[in-house]
Amino acid sequence: MSIISAEAQKVREALIAKGIETPTVQLTKDKDSRRAEIQQHMRSVLELLGLDLQDDSLEETPHRLAKMYVDEIFSGLDYATFPKITNIENRMKVSEMVLVDDITLTSTCEHHFVTIDGKVAVAYYPKKWVIGLSKINRVVQFFAQRPQVQERFTEQILTAFQTILETDDVAVFVKATHFCVKCRGVKDTNSYTVTSAFGGVFLEDRETRKEFLGLINK
């Protein structure tokens, strides 16, 4: 069984309570078993598409896909991989906004399993705790590494940091290109989607929200 940290469990419970956790079922098989079964099923899919899996270029593709799904692009479905975070007491009494902008977002649309590519900004006003800046990037990446819809992803990031930092004063802004729009269907290569989520002072005070949006739009 995977070991889930207390911090990860708190975040998961907060998402469930708000109804914004990614729809999942309880896993009963270990990673090796899941890789093996996914590999078998992907082999069938590729054969049904008419691909020759005896070809040197394709023979390892089912294995590569299984490994990629379990260990890489969907690893965020397993809370055992949640970033290790140590809350640091705010002894310096930092009271100004802490903002991390232009965080790389690479996720997967859960409707068509193609790429979501964009940027994320996260800001908070410290109270009792602060965290290492790189941890903000890592938490964003954790939630990106699962099948996603952008609206839920944005809310998950907000709730995760509110839970970790024990403050409502968090803001999240996401701007992304969806390849389910870009490479299929309407095939619009220029459009992007913007979502945001605000808590605490960012939600209640217009000037604070304006300051945040002004900083990330420079």
Swiss-Prot record:
Q: Known Pfam families for this protein?
A: GTP_cyclohydroI
Keywords of this entry: GTP-binding, Hydrolase, Metal-binding, Nucleotide-binding, One-carbon metabolism, Zinc
Q: Which PROSITE patterns match?
A: GTP_CYCLOHYDROL_1_1 (PS00859)
Q: What is an annotated GO biological process for this record, any one?
A: tetrahydrofolate biosynthetic process
In alphabetical order, the GO MF annotations are: GTP binding; GTP cyclohydrolase I activity; zinc ion binding
Q: Which InterPro entries match?
A: GTP-CH-I_C/QueF (IPR043133), GTP-CH-I_N (IPR043134), GTP_CycHdrlase_I (IPR001474), GTP_CycHdrlase_I_CS (IPR018234), GTP_CycHdrlase_I_dom (IPR020602)
The pathway noted for it is: Cofactor biosynthesis; 7,8-dihydroneopterin triphosphate biosynthesis; 7,8-dihydroneopterin triphosphate from GTP: step 1/1
**One of the record's GO cellular component terms:** cytoplasm
Substrates-to-products reaction catalysed: GTP + H2O = 7,8-dihydroneopterin 3'-triphosphate + formate + H(+)
EC nos:
3.5.4.16
Q: What is the uppermost EC class here?
A: hydrolase
Q: Which residues bind Zn(2+)?
A: C109, H112, C180
**Entry-linked HAMAP family:** FolE
- Family, similarity comment: Belongs to the GTP cyclohydrolase I family.
Self-association and partners:
Toroid-shaped homodecamer, composed of two pentamers of five dimers.
Per its UniProt record, what PANTHER family does this chain match? GTP CYCLOHYDROLASE 1, GTP CYCLOHYDROLASE I
Return the protein name: GTP cyclohydrolase 1
Biological source species: Actinobacillus pleuropneumoniae serotype 5b (strain L20)
| Species lineage | Bacteria, Pseudomonadati, Pseudomonadota, Gammaproteobacteria, Pasteurellales
**Gene transcribed to yield this protein:** folE
